[in-house]
Amino acid sequence: VSNLWKVESGKSKQAIPPKAWTWVEYPKGISYKVDSAGEWEWITILLVEFSAGGSVLRGRFGRYPGTEKLDETGHDDKNIGGWDGKVYHLHWAHTIKCDPSMPVGFWIWHDSKSPIVLDGRQIKAKKL
């Protein structure tokens, strides 16, 4: 069983300001729920247009995004030095024990001098 939500490349872009944790916006908002309880592998794939001067891009899955119950999990920092002006597909994955009442989202942070842009983006939950 798996669920996939995606924004096609070229349909809608999202600017991510530097040095500010920002929730990635997928087609129905910033959070998604699974159909049944269990262990789910969450995967996100982002098409990132890099600006100048960055050295790190951080990504983390979060349970209960946008609420006081926020609980981060599955973090991964990527070295983006030398990627100025380039466009890359990047992905993150993490296994989360969750049920239909628990929303999950993904947020990112970067240290570039100006916003980076997300073009195509998708989030998938696959039951293990």
Range-by-range predicted roles:
Residues L47-W109:
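Terminal beta-strand-rich extracellular "head" domains
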Residues G10-T22, A37, G81-V87, S101:
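Solvent-exposed, conformationally flexible loop/turn segments
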Residues V7, W23-E25, W42-T44, G85, ...:
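Intrinsic disorder/low-complexity segments enriched in polar/charged and small flexible residues
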Residues S2-I16, A37, S112-L128:
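C-terminal interaction-tip segments
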